[in-house]
Amino acid sequence: PNGFNEVSAFMSDNPFIQYLMQPILLIGVVYHFVMGFVLEAQNKKARGPVAYQKYNGAANASWMSRNMLVSGSVILIFLLLHLYDFWVPTITDHYIAPNPEFAQGNYFMDHLNHVFTLEGALSFVRLVIYIVAFVFLSLHLQHGFASAFQSIGARHNKYTPVIVAFGKWYSILIPAGFIIIAVYHFFVK
């Protein structure tokens, strides 16, 4: 708990993170999401007004590549919930209506535990939402990681298999770590 609180306090008090990195991250997420919609619209426009007579999406593209907009939308909804759960209370308790508990050492860990120990079934529903969102994040990353390299022209017989393999591991390990954190805080109250 102490390490978690120290890192969280560092991030909430560090002007570099709060006033430079956080806005850049927000702009990047919004840009990424908007470009996802733009790309989807361009793809639909390129197909024309007539639908395919017979469409076999699996013939040329994986399920993940065909459903990036779906997984991205689930992730965006989750991000809004996550901001509501953590960012809004932190900003409120730190800047808007200062809470004396904020200066105490366990504020962040206590708040994290609170989110997953809400009224009975609500905390279980919250846990399920987090897990489902992280599964969608895994699917989104599995396609998006290698696809990002291909989009910037980094496609080569020698390097692409390494990028794809790294992307698969990355897309499993990062969301799995987030799932472990959520499950841990649900069961360790």
Predicted features and spans:
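Membrane-embedded alpha-helical bundles that constitute the cytochrome b-like, heme-associated redox core
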Residues: 1-189
